[in-house]
C-alpha cells in the first residue's frame, strides 16, 4: 500500500509581534489569571499583510526547495481559512499565482472554523492514497488572521475580549502532502471524527467574532474525548497514555491545552494527578513552544503545534504523534502519524525558530495604532494603496528573504509585491 503524509511543512509567524505580558499590564488585566493562558508573544498582522501573503510566505521555502518537475506534480492546492477576503474568489487563486504553480491543478478553499486545516489535510491525504494520479502532490495552506477592530463610537473592550486579545494571533502553515512522507507519515484509517451544531464561537461579521467562551471550552473538551473514543474503536488497543509518544492539540492558548490534557489523562487514561504534570511536560509541552510565540492562528493552529512538536521533541527513534483538531460550530478529529529521526532533521531545515526570533517587536503605541484600525483594510474594500512605511523600521527586519506584501487593491483586485 502506498504511504501518504507530510513531505515538508513550514510556518510563517508574521513580520511583527507583541509581548503579551506588556499587553496584559497595559490593559490592567489580572496578571495571575493572565499567566494561566501560558502565552508569551502574539503575531500581529500589519495593514499590508493578509491571509494570502501569510500563506505564500509560509509556502515559498517549500516550493523553492523543489525541482521544476516536482513542483509541476502539485495537482491540488487547498487553502483553509476563516479569514477569507471574498465570498466567491478563494485565497488559493492568488496563492497559486504568486507561487507560480502548474495550471493543471485543482484549487479551492475550505472553511469550518479552526478545523479547516485538518479538513484540507485529510482531503489531500486521501487524494494521495486514492492513487488516481500516481506521484502527484498536494499543497495545503492554512492561513488565518485575528484582526478585531474597535467599533466606531466605542473604545471600551469587554472583559471577555480583554483576556482573548493576548492569544489572538496571525499566521500560516504550509504542508506539502505526497507519497514520500519524510516528516509525518499518516496512520491510514486511524481517524476518529465527531461533530454537531453548537453556537460556541462564530464570525457573523468580517472583522469580529461572537460566542460563548465557556460553551466553547466545554465543546472542545467533549470533542477531545469523543474523537479519541472513536479513534479507539477503529484502532483496537489504542491507549491515550502509551500509544502516542507525543500529543499535538489545536491550541487557542496553552492553558486550554493543559486543561484538556489533564481532563483526558484523568477521565480516559485513568492516571493519578501526580503523574499528569510530568506527562504534560514530556508529551505536550514541546508542541506549545511555537504556539506560545504566535498565538491562536485558527485553522493553522494544530499544524503549528505539530511543527513545534517535531522541531522541539526528541526523535532518536521513530515516534507516534497523536493529533487533536477542533473547530467551533463544531467539527473535530483525532488522528495520528509517525515521525522519524530523519523526518525531524528534514523539518528543522526550515529554521522556524530563527524566523520567529527575527520578527519586529511592536511597542504598545505601535500596536494601538494598528489595533484601532489605522490603515487596516476592511473586508470588501474596493480601492486602497498601502503604506509600507506606516511604522518605520519594520521593512528593514524583512530583508533576510524575499517576502510578499499587499501593495494595493484596485477595483477589488488585490495586487502584491515581493520585497527583499
Swiss-Prot record:
It comes from Bacillus subtilis (strain 168). Disulfide bonds: none annotated. It comes from the Bacteria. It holds the Pfam family HMG_CoA_synt_C. Keywords: Antibiotic biosynthesis, Cytoplasm, Transferase. One of its GO terms (molecular function) is hydroxymethylglutaryl-CoA synthase activity. The active site is at 82 (proton donor/acceptor), 114 (acyl-thioester intermediate), 250 (proton donor/acceptor). The keyword Nucleotide-binding does not apply. It catalyses: 3-oxobutanoyl-[ACP] + acetyl-[ACP] + H2O = (3S)-hydroxy-3-methylglutaryl-[ACP] + holo-[ACP] + H(+). It is an enzyme of class 2 (transferase). Pathway: Antibiotic biosynthesis; bacillaene biosynthesis. GO terms for biological process: acetyl-CoA metabolic process; antibiotic biosynthetic process. Its EC number is 2.3.3.-. One of its GO terms (cellular component) is cytoplasm. This is Polyketide biosynthesis 3-hydroxy-3-methylglutaryl-ACP synthase PksG. Involved in some intermediate steps for the synthesis of the antibiotic polyketide bacillaene which is involved in secondary metabolism. It catalyzes the aldol condensation between the acetyl group attached to the acyl-carrier-protein AcpK (Ac-AcpK) and a beta-ketothioester polyketide intermediate linked to one of the consecutive thiolation domains of PksL. InterPro entries: HMG_CoA_synt_C_dom, HMG_CoA_synth_N, Thiolase-like. Belongs to the thiolase-like superfamily. HMG-CoA synthase family. It is found in: Cytoplasm.
